[in-house]
């Protein structure tokens, strides 16, 4: 991507459950350029998907917002990678994953700050939500810092829907299934609002179908 260019790359993928989804997305960003990745990953037997930004120019930026949903017999390994080369570069990665019916969901991120990336800032937030007792969710943020003058932070958390939250919503006249769906919609809301409206509607429909399966 050339100087001062901007690109927002939005995808919502829904593959057949027998597909092996191994694809590569990469952006080389020059001075004052910006790449934004927004992804929803559904379906497939196995997915390995990590959009990458190489921030080569001064003040280049990358933002990533993504969600994946692993159901029965699925192993979805998703996230993003960024390499800071230029000075005063910026990255933000927010990755979320859900798993149910024995699915395996892994959120994996990498932020590398090279020696030349003086003044770089990088923030990572990985959150995973497990929807039953037989599924697996992993959050794996990785940071490599070679520059002393950089600001880097990362968070990772794995949780379940609490019985207290379900009970509270049920006392308000909401069924247990709808209560779970509401909590999931809240969990994925950050991603939905970054998508074009038709993509957001499609993603919400896919989440609804995944919640109904099993």
Identify the role of each PLM range.
Residues 1-167, 171-174, 192, 197-214:
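Conserved beta-strand/loop scaffold segments within soluble protein domains that form the structured core
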